[in-house]
Amino acid sequence: KQVSCINDPYGDVIKPESTMMLDYEVELALVIGKTCYQVSAEEASNYIFGYMICNDISMRDWQLHNMPDRVELMIGKSHDSHGPTGPWIVTSEEIADPHNLKINCYVNNELRQSSDTGDMIWDCFEQIEYLSSAMTLKPGDIITTGTPPGSGFSPRGASGKADKERKGNVFLEPGDLVKCEIESIGTIVNKIILG
């Protein structure tokens, strides 16, 4: 994501008229606390200042545009306002285990995503090891760690299993209210507006 997409934890999220497939993704966000390069997973925790929530808003049709056989991850995720984060940074000393936190997302009070950060494909420390193997991470850099099943683009519901009630994809519309919460961190809430 581009830094210009960062939004406050209660800011409105713009749904451009150019997208029909605006999606939500609750994610644990890591905030880097000191410069690191080629850091092992075993030492990665020493470089995390703290944790936040990120709603990794995505325009799925933009991601698939011109690339039907793969997903484009930059412009489809970097529109202005599409990176609400917060509600504050909880320091790493305050989170005993970042891989044991409940994580949920609601759209209009309907539970859409529900999981635990222990279900991540790559844990926080492995992600820092991988990223720092190729680039220097600087204080203030934010790493979003991936989302659980149940996004609007996913055929699976909050349980992670096929949702028989769900008829296809479910995307965001103006007026929708998206609430993302992570245990021990807090809650962010964003209203979708047409822009």
Task: Identify the meaning behind each predicted range.
Residues E27-V31, M52, N104:
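Residues embedded in well-ordered beta-strands
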Residues P9, V39-A41, D61-Q63:
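Short helix/loop capping segments that flank catalytic or ligand/cofactor-binding pockets
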Residues C5, A29-V31, P84-W88:
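Conserved hydrophobic/aromatic beta-strand scaffold that supports enzyme active sites
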Residues R60-G195:
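Catalytic-pocket segment enriched in acidic/His residues
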Residues A41-M52:
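Short Gly/aromatic-enriched secondary-structure transition segments
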Residues K1-E17:
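Extended, compositionally biased flexible segments
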Residues V13-L22, L28, C36-E43, E72-K77, ...:
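A generic local secondary-structure boundary/capping motif
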